[in-house]
Amino acid sequence: MEYFGKLLQVLDRLCPISGVFEKALKPLIIQKEVGTVKNMLREGEVQQQIWFVVSGLVREISSSADTVSGRTSWFWYAGDFVFAHPGFFAGLPSLVEIEAYPGTVLLELSRLDLALLIQNFQEGSVLIETLRYRNQAARSAHTSDLVNLKHAEMVRRYYHEHKVVFLTARAKDIASFLGIKDNGIHRFLRGL
């Protein structure tokens, strides 16, 4: 599997992994390529897989009283692990939907196989706690930006950190993620 090496690099940065763990993990991974926009998880479902983004973009959609289609509450990029927050690790019904954009390549691990890895390998639980911590820290930083930054600064910063999102995602998805009205994001993008 050509993308397994990328997964191992990311895992090893989170926690040193043993050769035995690597051998146990490899046959459990399934590669998925997204051809069209794909809803991977619906609100109320229990997520049965965790995904690793090899390339492409995945978004989280939260219910919103002000829009029928919901709002983009999170993006996952290449090198990220995709899981419903909260809910996945507790096995609870998801409060969000997860959607992958066309061209996204994912590696998938079932919830059951993940549980066995956590149970049988010391690094399994360390990896999970590190993933949860990093996810929560990134979400907290984003919430802080939404509260503390002006829209123009937030768009500028996000554009420079994640240009690929602007080539892949719909403007309305980016706008809702940044807390901006759909039609307002274009004026902030001028001059970038």
Which role does the model predict for each range below?
Residues 1-30, 87:
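Cyclic nucleotide-binding regulatory module and flanking cytosolic helices
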Residues 30-45, 66-67, 76-80:
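Conserved short histidine dyad/triad with adjacent acidic residue
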Residues 48-63, 79:
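Glycine- and acidic-residue-biased ligand/ion/polar-headgroup-sensing regions
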Residues 61, 84-85, 116-117, 158, ...:
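Residues that scaffold the ATP/ADP-binding catalytic core of kinase and kinase-like folds
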Residues 71-130:
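Cyclic-nucleotide recognition modules
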Residues 83, 141-154:
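Short, Lys/Arg-enriched anionic-surface-contact patches
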Residues 149-192:
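Phosphate-/nucleic-acid-contacting segments
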